[in-house]
Structures are given as structure tokens and as C-alpha cells.
Amino acid sequence: MYRLQIEKIRGFRDFYPEDMDVEKFIFKTAEEAAEAFGFRRIDFPSLEYLDLYRIKSGEELLQQTYSFVDKGGREVTLIPEATPSTVRMVTSRKDLQRPLRWYSFPKVWRYEEPQAGRYREHYQFNADIFGSDSPEADAEVIALASSILDRLGLQDIYEIRINSRKIMEEIIGGMTSSDPFSVFSIIDRYHKISREEFVDQLRSAGIGEDGVSMIADLCSGTRGIDEMARITGKSSEEIARMAAVEDLLASYGVKNVRYDFSIVRGLSYYTGIVFEAYDRSGQFRAILGGGRYDNLASLMSGESVPAVGFGMGDAVISLLLKRENVQIPREKKSVYICRVGKINSSIMNEYSRKLRERGMNVTVEIMERGLSAQLKYASAIGADFAVIFGERDLERGVVTIRNMYTGSQENVGLDSVVEHLISQAT
């Protein structure tokens, strides 16, 4: 008989229970950090009009969309990122009190080459502040990003790297009459291509030899923000603003900040500060990234709404947690209720209900199998305790409680089972 073999689509993931434990940890940690900063959660459709991304996302992103014409003849797409949808929501309501601090955790889709930490479908945490053009807003979103990584147990493996689109426009504007974004697109690929390719692409964009040498040198390493005026030969308001952001970040306790000219971010709507959390080991370049985008709302609605935010994908974070051997905490203690002999299921269900009411997770044996098989299963699902209801023990009014980690066990009276487990779980 022919059997249809259907495999998972390339670039997409299945999440088994142990995978979802990691995802839940990432979601919960990011959400708790965001709400500690006063951010509130939003959500939006997974499907948007394609025109939403034609406004200012850039040609490369448009080519990566999962877009199609629906049955109503409309050009739509699975969302490739969250920012345009979030801005659409901001501009759709005039009664919202600003500044708005919003976060979201949608799935996003991009048709790009899968690789470690990069898939065609992933969850992306996003946090944005709308309605403030201050350095304080810039620093706050970076501090939130840093707080999330620290809470995840990744505090020693990253540094914050920042740049400014305005400063880069000042530098590049004097080198070419071409659209600066075409040069930004090349700089964004600096770490993905050889130096020879990088230099050739800059020349093709109309940059002269002196400019090519300067850009290549600027992108070759990180610097302190206090070096900016000397390096650029400028003393602009934007350089002063970047220094102010650094000082504000220090007051948040974020001190691992470096200036990196190669950080420009690939999307065309950024207007000021841009930043990434950089993996110090070099295995993954950008752990998260974002920046200021003050003009996107006006392109959609004509209303000017300054904004700054960042996005963080789950895939790289999950790989970093594994690499750094971060132990995923268990939210609740769990119990597996076993049966030996002819045991009425009602008594097992009664005690499972009592334990659940006290906040424990309880799984009840529903198969007819030996005790060793039950204990093996309890271990496989990560139960902390096994409560063994034995036919003979019940005649004496006791059950056996086994600690699944130490292997120790003891007999406990039926009237003390719940309190005993609660005391052991705390």
C-alpha cells in the first residue's frame, strides 16, 4: 500500500514539548522585562496588504515576502516584520495617549536562505516607543533589550554596538551623489562578503578611491563614542546625541557599548540611531537589532510620529541558550501519579485535583503497565515526584512518594499527601 510521505517544508520548524519549554522561557522573560519597563502588549494580523511594505521597507525585503493575490484580487503578504503593522495601528487611532510603549511577539515570514539561527518562519519579539524623539527614548529601548538578554542568562556574551544613520549620511553624502541607502545596503553586507567584494561594490555605487578606503577602514573595527568627532572630523548635534545616549545607558547599568560604523541595519526607514546586540564569540553577529524611524508614520498617514524600537528573533536566542548551557527554569513542580494493582481511578483523580488546586502540575497514569515502565515515563516527561498508589498500601491508608531526582522514597498517609508534596516542592 502506498504511503504519502510529507516532510516539513525547508526553513520551517516543528516545536516538540522540550522545544516549547525553551520558547515559553524566551516569551515569558521578554514579556516580564517589557512590562517592568511599562510596555504593554499588542497584536495584529499575520496577513497585511503588500503596499504596507512598499512604503519604505526596501526592495530586498519585498523580494523575500510570502505574498500572493487573494480570492478578492488583493495583493497581500504574510508579515515579514512587525514595524509597519505596529505603525499602522498607531496612526489608525487619534485618541492614544503618547508616548506609547508597546511590545509584541508575532510570527514573521521571509523567503531567505535558511542557516543557523535564521529560518523562513520565526517568532520575533518587538518593542517600540512612539511619540518621543528624545535620547531618553533611544536609551530606554536599548536598556530594555539589554535587560532581556541579562534575564535570559546571556549577560556575559554580548555587547551593544551602535551607529547613526544621520552621521553615516553626513559622511557618505560628501562622497557620492547616489542614494545613501544604496551604500548602506553594501555596508550592511560588510561581514557577509569578502573585503574585495565590499570594495568593488562601493566603487560600483560611485564612491571614489579615497571614500572607499575611508569606509572600509571605518567598518573594520569598533570604537569609543568619544572618538567620533576626531574620526569623522565633525562635531554635530547627532554626535552629541550619541554621547548622551551612552551616558543614559550607563545610568541603566548598560556599559558594554561600542560605536560600530558597519551597523546600518538593512531596512530603509531608519533615520537616526541604529543598534545591535553583538555576539562576542562571533558565532552569531546580530542577536537583536533596531533603531529610530521618525518618518515611517508620516509616509503612511501624513502624521509625524517619532519612533524607536527593536526586534529580537527567537531562533538565535534558543541556540545561544543551548550554547551557554542556560538551565530553563521550571515554573511549577510536577507530579506523576502511578498505580500498582487494581486501583480505582477515582481516588487518583481526587488527589490529582487537590494537587492542581494547590498549583502543581499533575499527570495521571492511564495505561495498564508495570511500575518500572511508569517510572521511566515519569522521568521522561520531567516529573519531580511520583506518587505510587499501590493496592496493598491503600489498604493501610498510605501511598509511596518518590523523588524522581534523588530516587529516595517514603510512605505518606493519604491525609498528608497534598501537604507533604507542597512542602517538598517549595
UniProtKB/Swiss-Prot annotation:
The keyword Ligase applies. One of its GO terms (molecular function) is ATP binding. It is found in: Cytoplasm. InterPro entries: aa-tRNA-synth_II (IPR006195), aa-tRNA-synth_II/BPL/LPL (IPR045864), Anticodon-bd (IPR004154), Anticodon-bd_dom_sf (IPR036621), His-tRNA-ligase (IPR015807), HisRS-like_core (IPR041715), HisRS/HisZ (IPR004516), HisRS_anticodon (IPR033656). One of its GO terms (cellular component) is cytoplasm. It comes from the Archaea. GO terms for biological process: histidyl-tRNA aminoacylation. Its EC number is 6.1.1.21. It is an enzyme of class 6 (ligase). The keyword Aminoacyl-tRNA synthetase applies. Its main location: cytoplasm. Keywords: Aminoacyl-tRNA synthetase, ATP-binding, Cytoplasm, Ligase, Nucleotide-binding, Protein biosynthesis. SUPFAM superfamilies: Class II aaRS ABD-related, Class II aaRS and biotin synthetases. It catalyses: tRNA(His) + L-histidine + ATP = L-histidyl-tRNA(His) + AMP + diphosphate + H(+). PANTHER family: HISTIDINE--TRNA LIGASE, MITOCHONDRIAL-RELATED (PTHR43707:SF1), HISTIDYL-TRNA SYNTHETASE (PTHR43707). Belongs to the class-II aminoacyl-tRNA synthetase family. This is Histidine--tRNA ligase. It comes from Thermoplasma acidophilum (strain ATCC 25905 / DSM 1728 / JCM 9062 / NBRC 15155 / AMRC-C165). The gene is hisS.
